[in-house]
A protein has these predicted regions:
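Alpha-helical transmembrane segments of bacterial inner-membrane membrane proteins
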Residues: 1-182
């Protein structure tokens, strides 16, 4: 029995080391796509100062995003749903690919057309609010047209667990919501 326990313990340690090595190699090979860049800086409840942005810009190409939870409301007020709101700039994503069912360029999907910014939502949001492409939702003071179903974000793994469906908008669209307060 003693020798069986030693053999079992040795096999378990070997298996754990093999799995850990595989995970490490995978992260090394796909780290940029998982993170969405080479380095990630996160600020909580404040914007980067001009000096901080200058220092970060000196490191290479910069992409900024804003994340928060908000309520997406139907224009008639009949329903609403909590969303993980993410606003991205024109450089997003630096690495990897944002995937939608439409396949159109992100700038076209999120841009301002006739005074309304675009938004990309996960299928579960469409299902919960009985939405279809072209429908509008309200976020804060802004109105957004749902232009595509979001299927994959390159940096989603680095952002941890979400409590609600993702809704992706542009940083210009975020300014229209007036959800950011000093």
């Amino acid at each position: 029995i003693f020798l069986a326990c030693i053999a079992l313990g040795t096999a378990a340690i070997g298996a754990v080391n093999t799995v850990a090595d595989g995970i490490g190699k995978s992260i090394s090979a796909q780290g940029q796509s998982i993170l969405g860049g080479d380095i990630g800086f996160e600020l909580v409840q404040r914007e980067a100062t001009a000096d901080e942005l200058k220092q970060i810009n000196a490191l290479g190409t910069l992409s900024q995003s804003i994340g928060l939870r908000s309520m997406a409301r139907l224009p008639d007020g009949s329903d609403q749903n909590l969303v993980e709101l993410k606003a991205v700039d024109n450089a997003y994503p630096l690495y990897g690919a944002l995937k939608t069912l439409s396949g159109k360029p992100i700038a076209e999907l999120l841009g301002n057309a006739n005074g309304t910014y675009g938004a990309l939502g996960q299928q579960i949001l469409f299902d919960r609010l009985s939405l279809k492409l072209g429908d509008k939702v309200l976020l804060g003071d802004g109105t957004f047209e749902l232009r595509a179903i979001l299927t994959s974000e390159p940096d989603a793994l680095s952002e941890g667990f979400g409590f609600a469906p993702r809704l992706l908008i542009s940083t210009d669209g975020m300014a229209a919501t007036k959800l950011e307060r000093p």
